[in-house]
Amino acid sequence: MIKPFTTRVILYVLILLLCTAKGFAANPLQAFQATTTPEAVPHFPDRVHTFVFRNWNLVPLERLALVLKTSPENVARVADSLGLPEYQEPAWPTEQIYITLIRRNWHLLPYEQLLELVEMTPERLAFALQEDDFLWVKLGFLKPLCEPLYYQAPDEAAQKRAAAIKKVLQENVGPPLAQKNAVQRFAFIEDLRKTHPDPDFVASDSKALRYIYSYFALYGDTLASDDTEVFSDGLLEKLGRLGVNGVWLHVVLREMAPGGEKFPEFGHGHEKRIANLRKVVEQAKRYNIDIYLYMNEPRTMPNAFFQRADIEGREKIAGAPAPGGYTALCISTPDVQNWIKDSLAYIFSEVPGLGGVFTISGSENHTHCNSHGGWQNCPQCKSKTGAEVTALANALVEEGVHRSAPDAKVILWDWGWNGHGIATDIIEKLPTNIWLQSVSEWALPIERGGVGSTVGEYSISSVGPGPRAQLHWKAAKERGMKAVAKVQLNCTWEIAAVPYVPVMDLIAEHCSNLAECDIDGMLMSWTLGGYPSPNLEISRLFDRTPVPSQAAVLDELAEKRYGKEGAPLARKAWTLMSDAYREYPYSGGVVYNAPVQVGPANLFRPNATGYNATMVGIPYDHLDGWRGHYPPEIFAGQLQKVSKGFAEGIEQLTKAVALAPKPHKYDIEAELRYAEVVQIHFESVANQVHYVLLRDEYAKPETPAARKEEIKKQMRPLVESEIALAKRLYQLTLEDSSIGFESTNQYFYVPNDLLEKIVSCFDLLE
């Protein structure tokens, strides 16, 4: 789940709810109907060639042929004509890459063929669009109206264009596209499955909570399938050695326990989910790791749910209305209160050893009657204050959990309380045997490029804690509660295309600051950032008495990874990159809309598309959506500062790698790759800003002819730079399958996307 905080994203969610009424439409995809014109792809001969290029080696050849209603041989001939690498049977199930497939075919295929490609029923796709981490939001709340796409033998013009593309790729990447020793996508999972028992390892006896998300777990209904791998033994082992003692999972309460007489609709398939949860808990326990369930409850229900005359009192549990024909389950009513408490008590009695839960009770999902501030529209809740309603929603969770598991942790997150403002009025009404969690960096004042603002969340470039978290922790401590900092130590939506951003000075500074606060634990990631990294080790190194200095921790880590000779160079590199990262042009609009996740994989469009950038989905060419509150030139300038500082750091890190002990080469070469990916992405986004500005100026009717000639000259080096960046990033992706991956978005880009960027840029140069 993404937790947006900008007005625009909140509007997205309201529109989503207005567009969906799950389970009541004759056509499950009716709420997601196609309406807009698909984006043109002028650099390919036709749509068939585009489809083959974008899906080659991502799904089985036979399925590509099935979609196009042709033979595998015809599809293979198209791929060969374009100069694509030899066919390799994908080693992953479609479920593991379906989001990537949907996104890259959104403008190519109608729903019927999209369903064939991703092997889904209309019901499953509708569920994915609505429930799988806001996929419909990430696709822009629209489906382009695509004509059916069937194979036709390429005509002479198409053959000629395909041959030109093949020539471009062979001359710039080399036959067979330098993929001979390339790793397949998702190869990192196999690496993370490997265990390496260490008889000398001694687990920390620290009582501090350190919990995180699984790096590669599917976000949706994770426990519904016996075949779903939530995490591997190797991943748990690695996380445990880095001081992690908890992993969290997303669940929906009504799917985890029987609903009883009052809610017979609930609980279908709960037996399997409970059985799988037991297995997960037992697996994690072997590595001294507890499992925590994410509670975002109670979920709203369609209005028809409250109209069942055969269930006594059903109409009385209807609470505040929600958009889209939904209504809250009112937590002021005994039936709903008992259901919440009984369901949680059931889960914790059926799954001994479950670590606990954490709640979000003010998220973008409409849950209890005050989750979006509308408690006064509820007949039962309107006599209470908003703070009382929010506190009650959390108290019910605490009571249910502790009825069966008195020692389980109940972590209450203040996200969204009082519109992200000060919420001490809620804290003072909570039960005291809970842990109060707050985003560390929230409300920090920052200035980037002379532009002032305050931080929301998802920022490594802004070092917490901020004033809101400190005030809330203090209020919690005064009532005898525990306090938890929510942080992102590996990566954020500032850039999520690498497992971790090697800005160790920033991580150490944040951990050091938190060590001075009276807190009891950390949530170390949301769905992004769960990789077992040196950034996590920094947190572990601070978890000692007496607390070491930042310099001591960084020196220790550098020497461990790079040896005595390489350590000083690594430290210098980390400082250069950390200082550069402080210049990141942070804002909610930037982290959600700018092409920071895809870098050079985002195309240079020859003409304005008219499409708005989507939330960590498809950035298109929507510069005004990318830049947030920054003027375009300042936005680009800040990105160039980050890129330049990383380039300087990479020079030092390259020298450090050369001096490092051989046993650590694999890990530190990966660190160097990730630094280079970050540098490439930010240089590319700066290029894209300048390109769009020039392109749009060129397109204005009032632009003089002489100025247009100047613009063309200014655009050429930008296009040439993008070719070079795409070529380098392509090589890096062949070496490391984790580049471009994030669990809820799967692959932001794959190697072929960078080949397409090269092709499109050469087309522009012509």
Regions found by a protein language model. Name each.
Residues 9-22:
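Bacterial N-terminal signal peptides
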Residues 70, 120, 244, 287-289, ...:
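Short glycine/serine/threonine/alanine-rich loop segments
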